[in-house]
Amino acid sequence: MAFLKKSLFLVLFLGLVSLSICEEEKRETEEEEHDQEEDDKSEEKRFLSLIPHIVSGVASIAKHLG
């Protein structure tokens, strides 16, 4: 009987450890995805801030050609 209790506790302990590891990996993955989204947003903002300069450059070129 004691052997069965020890085995059961061992199985439960190993299950909790593996669950904890999986949750930690999931949390790290979510943080990496969040960081990637923030990087993408900042790149998009930088690109959008360049659009007025590009438009004015194209307009001045068109004015010189036209």
UniProtKB/Swiss-Prot annotation:
PTM sites of type Leucine amide: 65
One Pfam family per UniProt: FSAP_sig_propep
InterPro entries, per database record: Frog_antimicrobial_propeptide, FSAP
Signal peptide: 1-22
Keywords assigned: Amidation, Amphibian defense peptide, Cleavage on pair of basic residues, Immunity, Innate immunity, Membrane, Secreted, Signal, Target cell membrane, Target membrane
Any one Gene Ontology cellular component term annotated for this protein: membrane
Record-annotated membrane-spanning stretches: none
A Gene Ontology biological process term: innate immune response
Acidic residues bias (residue ranges): 30-41
Stated role: Antimicrobial peptide with high activity against Gram-positive bacteria, low activity against Gram-negative bacteria, and moderate activity against fungi. Acts by causing bacterial membrane disruption inducing leakage of the intracellular content followed by cell death. It adopts an alpha-helical amphipathic structure in membrane environments. Also shows highly potent antiparasitic activity against Leishmania species. Shows moderate hemolytic activity on human erythrocytes. Is also active on human monocytes.
Name of the protein: Phylloseptin-S6
Organism in which the protein naturally occurs: Phyllomedusa sauvagei (Sauvage's leaf frog)
